[in-house]
C-alpha cells in the first residue's frame, strides 16, 4: 500500500513535469517550484516505489525462490529496512513544504545548497530523508548479498545462478560501494550549513 501510494504520488509529479515541458509557455510560473517537483519525483520513485516494491517485496520473494532457500538470510532485517522509509518520505515531503523547498541542483552543485540559496531547513530535512533512505537501502543490500552467498542449495554454484539473482547481487554490491560516498558528501553539506565548516566553501579551502 505504501509503495502504491508513493507510485501514484510520483506519477502525478511526473505528469506535472511532462505537462510543464510539453507546452511552449510556463505552466507553473515558478522555476524553483519546478526544480522541487523534479527532485521530489526522483527521490519518491527510486526510494519509495522501486526499492520497497520491486526489490523489497518482489525481490525478497523471488530471490530465495530462485536459490532454493526457505527465506532470506535475515528476514527481520526486511522489516527494519522497510520501516525506515515512511519517516524518510515524511521528511522529504516536509522539506518540499518548508519555505521554497529543495531544488534540483542542491545535491550536485554545493553553492546552491548554501544558506544564501536555501536559508530555511528544507535542504536539512531532505538530507535527513536521504540518510534514512540510505540506511534502509544498505540494510536491504546486506540482506541480499548474504542470502545469495550463503543460502543457495548445495548443488547451485555461482555460475548457475539465474541472471535476475546476479543482477540483484551486483546492484547490491554497487549500492554498498556508492551510498557511503553520498552519505559522506551530504553529511559534509549538513555540517557546512549548520556548524560553519568549509568543506564546500571555495574561499575556505576545505576542512
From Swiss-Prot:
The keyword Nuclease does not apply. It is found in: Mitochondrion inner membrane. SUPFAM superfamilies: Cytochrome c oxidase subunit I-like. Fe(II)-heme a binds at residue 41. Belongs to the heme-copper respiratory oxidase family. Pfam families: COX1. Its EC number is 7.1.1.9. This is Cytochrome c oxidase subunit 1.
